[in-house]
Amino acid sequence: MAHKIILLACIALFCMGCKKELLPKPNGQLRLDYHEAGYAHFENSCPVTFDLNEAAIIKSKPDCGFTINYPKMKATIYISYKPVKNNIDVLLRDAQKLTYEHVIKADDILEQPFINKDHNVYGMFYQVNGNAATNAQFYVTDSTKHFLDCSVYFYAKPNFDSVMPAASYIKNDMRRIMESLRWK
């Protein structure tokens, strides 16, 4: 009888010892690192010049608009240029309207005025927080001859958390474009 008890105890210990305990793995986070931006001066026949990230691909349009592509980030900056012809109020209103169309999905829109008196460049930078289609836009003008607006769009469903590293990188490029912009 003692042998049977010892045998049953050994079988029970063997069965309990053979169970593989599953340990849950922690959630992994995708780390997106982008190289430090290097900038080159961009100039063509259009009446505006600015610094451009050397990793970006720029395409000029006949109306002096530009698309700046970031293939690795699946994003594009769209720049449109318009001459001012007694229509500065309409141009400003349209640029502001474009930004505030995102208020439905945006958590917050931060306005940051921009003034460069030395080069006659005045404008507004908008940082759009939340799951809006764009997370940054700006416009600049000299109020008499030139008007330029700029926005970035990603080729993905808006999800601020997932595009935040790329959005932050491109937002810095947009600020550089705005701050280095000169009228010809």
Model regions and ranges:
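Surface-exposed amphipathic alpha-helical segments
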Residues: 151-184
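Secretory pathway targeting signatures of secreted, lumenal, and periplasmic proteins
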Residues: 45-97
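C-terminal motif of bacterial Sec signal peptides marking the signal peptidase cleavage site
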Residues: 14-17
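Positively charged n-region of N-terminal signal peptides that target proteins for export
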Residues: 1-5
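Post-signal peptide N-terminal segment of mature Sec-exported envelope proteins
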Residues: 26-46
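Bacterial lipoprotein signal-peptidase II cleavage site
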Residues: 19-25
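Signature of long, low-cysteine stretches enriched in small and polar/charged residues
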Residues: 96-151
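Second-shell loop/turn segments in exported
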Residues: 77-85, 137-138, 160-168
